């Protein structure tokens, strides 16, 4: 996505660099016997904050796991958030987020990976008690775009999928040691 000051590119070719450098397909699927990971685009040149989910993206979520192994952990990857994280109250959500979250639940998604906020946070989130999806927000890994306490702090999440558990380890970069170090661990039943 081009920055707001490159208005023409942002409005008329917002994902040109992404498609050229990373991937043409804006809704890729990667799967094996244990995991099915579906990406859905929430970034559009006409939105300034929060992104959006249209009926087209909802259909990608609904049908994106067709053919996935029955026991495979279903993971949805989006840039913008689909649910508010209590610890980060007041942050932007994608337009159409609630419907997208419901659609993800109906599709059997158990883990949503997202970014946008440049803050590391992992928590189960549900629209109703007992129906939660784990939301893992990644901090910034390769820039200084963090916010608040995460400003200029680099993070990433290491995810391990086991037969009965999902393990997410948050790692933070220690510049004085030139390495990433685990700072928090989360384990969830599948």
Describe the role of every protein-language-model region.
Residues 1-63, 68, 102-103, 129, ...:
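Extended active-site neighborhood of metal-dependent phosphoesterases/phosphodiesterases
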Residues 89-163:
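Conserved beta-sheet core of the metallophosphoesterase superfamily
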Residues 1, 79, 116-118:
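Histidine-centered divalent metal-coordination motifs
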Residues 6-8, 48-53, 87-92, 146-150:
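Short, solvent-exposed loop/turn segments at secondary-structure boundaries
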Residues 160-190:
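A short C-terminal boundary segment appended to hydrolase-like catalytic domains
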Residues 34-44, 75-79, 133-140:
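Active-site-proximal beta-strand elements of phosphoester/diester hydrolases
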Residues 70-85:
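Short acidic, glycine-rich surface-loop motifs adjacent to enzyme active sites
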Residues 2-5, 46-48, 83-86, 121-123, ...:
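Short catalytic/ligand-binding loop motif for oxyanion handling, primarily in non-cytosolic enzymes
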